[in-house]
């Protein structure tokens, strides 16, 4: 049995667009207005998408159900396989007492929550995005900030927004590599174009984060830190993406930003230490709503731990960093893929759906159990368990409690990926994309919105580029705009959709202890997603028609 996708099931583009938007808007309605829990909103959206796919798009029931099930399985592996070991590793550090030492160490650097957020959420998170990606950075940094005493909502929300800067070059540049593969455009040209758009956002983001946390007046107190953090990151991101390609910008910019900020803190400190409400001057406990300010001539902190204790406490994150770097090496990745990958054709679904041009769509399930980022994190967690001093029985207890802690996030993520797969396979996303592509000369303005939508639905900039990259290139060519502008816009627009993707929300909520409060987290980030998206849309429109000198010179391959 085969079935061909349709873009205009109602034989009226406006009516088809309205129907296609129903399951997408349902997520916004459920989380913002009804304030549903994440798994409830995701299951509702998936059910609506199934009804639209079967009832309006005439997708066979069997194919629709298989597509939904395939998405849910993908949600379990590799996505949940990242979150489970990441939270397990963090819980080991808490149970062993290692995180208490880390908390005191962070306080010895600075107990100011604003600067802690810059170091961990922005800089360290960017480094992790460059090496691991796919949810791991948000899971790890949100857990760390919550453990340091951040308000859980702010910890998760700040990490989601901070993750905007590095997503385009995440996982050793895989989003741009995929964009190049599906469009035929040179990888370096796309990297250069993205590297001439995102650094402006990256430079402003640290200050934006601090304003979000503490307000404009208190943000001015740490303006030197925000400027050093943002400008060092943006400069390295721009240079590396333009001269080295997409593989290293996040890693180099993350390290450069951390080093620059630590150098600044050697001779500069904020005049006041800013903390969340209900924190005493020396507290590291969870905060509330009004900040506490205390004089900070010397930034008092807990007595520093002996170096050997500190090294032991940091060993889980050192192991994590080293293993993730090793896992990211191309030669290692190739060997792991060759040794430990099982690929299955999805029964009843593989090549059963034809795209609008009549080409069969392959549905393969890839179980790369060795090269998966989650495997690297689990290896680091097991090494950390061995070094933690916990007995195996205690480690097992930590693992089972982690599973219990993540039971609803796992359900949420499975439902979100089920939703993503059914709206893609049924053609619902193509209907929405086609409407945006019909905007003519204004298409460059809407091009980032397409990437934003793709990441909102799939939770992945890589998937959004695979989904819409070719459409972006062909539409740009048809209106006389350089296709590298709109393909790069798809990448750049996608990064600001990540913070509101239900998949990302579920990951951050699980790591930050906000299970059941996903709607609060969604409302926390959604406004900022739209603000940053509007900035990128205006930038891309200007690049397409006004600042054409920003477009890199490259040899145009034929689109395929």
What are the language-model segments listed below?
Residues 35-36, 94-99, 111-112, 145-154, ...:
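Juxtamembrane helix-boundary/capping and inter-helix hinge elements in multi-pass membrane proteins
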């Amino acid at each position: 049995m085969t079935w061909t996708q349709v873009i205009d099931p109602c034989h009226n583009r406006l009516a088809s667009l309205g129907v296609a938007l129903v399951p997408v808007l349902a997520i916004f309605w459920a989380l913002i207005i009804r304030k549903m829990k994440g798994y409830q909103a995701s299951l509702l959206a998936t059910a609506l998408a199934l009804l639209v796919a079967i009832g309006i798009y005439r997708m066979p029931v069997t194919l629709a159900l298989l597509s939904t099930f395939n998405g849910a399985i993908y949600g379990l592996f590799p996505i949940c396989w990242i979150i489970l070991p990441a939270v397990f590793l963090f819980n080991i550090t808490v149970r062993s007492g290692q995180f208490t030492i880390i908390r005191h160490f962070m306080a010895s650097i600075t107990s100011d929550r604003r600067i802690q957020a810059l170091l961990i959420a922005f800089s360290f998170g960017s480094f992790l995005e460059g090496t691991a990606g796919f949810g791991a950075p948000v899971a790890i940094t949100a857990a760390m900030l919550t453990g340091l005493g951040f308000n859980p909502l702010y910890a998760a929300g700040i990490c989601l927004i901070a993750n905007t800067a590095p997503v385009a070059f995440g996982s050793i540049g895989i989003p741009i590599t995929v964009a190049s593969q599906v469009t035929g455009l040179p990888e370096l040209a796309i990297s250069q174009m993205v590297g001439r758009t995102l650094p402006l956002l990256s430079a402003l983001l640290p200050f934006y984060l601090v304003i979000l946390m503490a307000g404009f007046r208190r943000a001015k107190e740490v303006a030197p830190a925000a400027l050093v953090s943002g400008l060092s990151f943006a400069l390295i991101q721009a240079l590396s993406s333009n001269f080295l390609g997409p593989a290293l910008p996040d890693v180099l910019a993350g390290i450069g930003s951390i080093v620059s900020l630590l150098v600044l803190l050697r001779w500069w400190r904020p005049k006041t230490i800013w903390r969340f409400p209900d924190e005493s001057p020396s507290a590291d406990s969870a905060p509330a709503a009004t900040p506490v300010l205390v004089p900070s001539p010397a930034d008092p902190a807990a007595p520093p731990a002996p170096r050997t204790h500190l090294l032991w406490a940091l060993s889980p994150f050192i192991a994590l960093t080293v293993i993730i770097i090793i896992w990211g090496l191309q030669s290692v990745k190739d060997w792991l893929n060759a040794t430990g990958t099982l690929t299955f054709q999805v029964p009843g679904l593989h090549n059963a759906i034809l795209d609008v041009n009549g080409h069969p769509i392959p549905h393969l399930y890839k179980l790369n159990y060795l090269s998966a980022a989650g495997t690297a994190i689990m290896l680091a967690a097991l090494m950390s368990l061995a070094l933690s001093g916990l007995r195996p029985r205690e480690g097992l207890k930590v693992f089972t409690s982690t599973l219990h802690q993540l039971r609803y996030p796992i359900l949420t993520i499975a439902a979100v990926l089920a939703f993503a797969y059914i709206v893609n396979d049924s053609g619902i996303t193509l209907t929405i994309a086609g409407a945006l592509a019909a905007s003519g000369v204004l298409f460059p303005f809407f091009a980032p919105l397409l990437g934003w939508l793709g990441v909102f639905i799939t939770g992945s900039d890589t998937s959004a580029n695979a989904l819409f990259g070719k459409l972006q290139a062909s539409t740009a060519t048809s209106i006389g705009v350089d296709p590298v502008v709109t393909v790069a816009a798809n990448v750049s627009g996608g990064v600001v959709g990540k913070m509101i993707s239900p998949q990302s929300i579920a990951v951050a909520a699980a790591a930050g202890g906000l299970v059941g409060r996903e709607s609060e987290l969604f409302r926390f980030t959604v406004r900022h997603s739209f603000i940053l998206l509007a900035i990128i849309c205006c930038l891309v429109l200007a690049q397409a028609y006004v600042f054409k000198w920003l477009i890199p010179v490259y040899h145009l391959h034929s689109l395929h």
